[in-house]
Amino acid sequence: MELTQAGATLYAYAREILDLHRIAKRAVSDLVELVTGKLTIGASFTVGEYVLPRILAAFTRKYPDVKFSVIIGNTEFVHEHARDSSIDVGLVEGLVDDPQLEVTKFLDDELILIVSKNHPLAGASVSPEELEAKLKDVPFIIREEGSGTRLAVEKALEKLNFKPSNMIVLGSTQAIKESVEANLGVTMLSKWTLRKEIKLGSIKPIRCCNPFKRGFYLIQHKDKFQSRACAEFIRFILEQTLRLF
């Protein structure tokens, strides 16, 4: 059976219509799948300065249409902003106990006891029993109240039964590192903050016991609407962070 001229013409147009329908459907699907929008991220100092930049760089390469606004403070500061929903997601050091928040660990951390390369104990192994005697006259430099690092360090010192007699409080990890390099005192900091200095040899660890482990956590309000961009950012952090470091 052969189509009439009118039928052949109609058939050609019908095929074009079907092809256009498939193209339009694919285009709409691509638009729906496109991840766009703006995220407001809160990060504690350690995470915001030493971990988050690499995550954002990798995420932006994959999702260039997502824009970011990042606020940085200590863990208590980020916790408060997550509670009042003024940020989409927070990244903090130390476990946050709050029934209003979803809390998920995304990276392991370790606290390292460090001194200047010129300190007599640089690179030494010291038993916990010897630690207080050897460091009793050395200022211990620590972060401010409300810092997740400070809380973790206080717990570590308690386990070591080490009570520094002279403590210097500084509100910046970088300031603490500079002070240790200048041989002002001793401190404990996250391993993620010390990669460059240890590689350069300007700061040396003191090995005194088993590693002090902690986690970095992702926090967000349970009742806050989660945009597609936010969902993809969280998924990216949980799936890709370990590969970036």
Which stretches of residues belong to each language-model region?
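Short beta-strand->loop
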Residues: 102-112, 191, 200-213
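Hydrophobic hinge/microswitch elements
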Residues: 74-79, 83-87, 92-93, 152-205
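Short amphipathic alpha-helical coupling segments at ligand-binding clamshell hinges
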Residues: 6-13, 51, 55, 127, ...
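A late-sequence structural motif
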Residues: 51, 204-245
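Alpha-helical "hinge/linker" immediately C-terminal to small N-terminal DNA-binding modules
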Residues: 2-33, 238-242
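Flexible hinge/capping segments at coil-to-helix
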Residues: 101-111, 115-141, 228
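Secondary-structure junction motif
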Residues: 121-125, 139-160, 227-234, 244-245
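Central regulatory/effector-binding core of bacterial HTH transcription factors
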Residues: 34-99
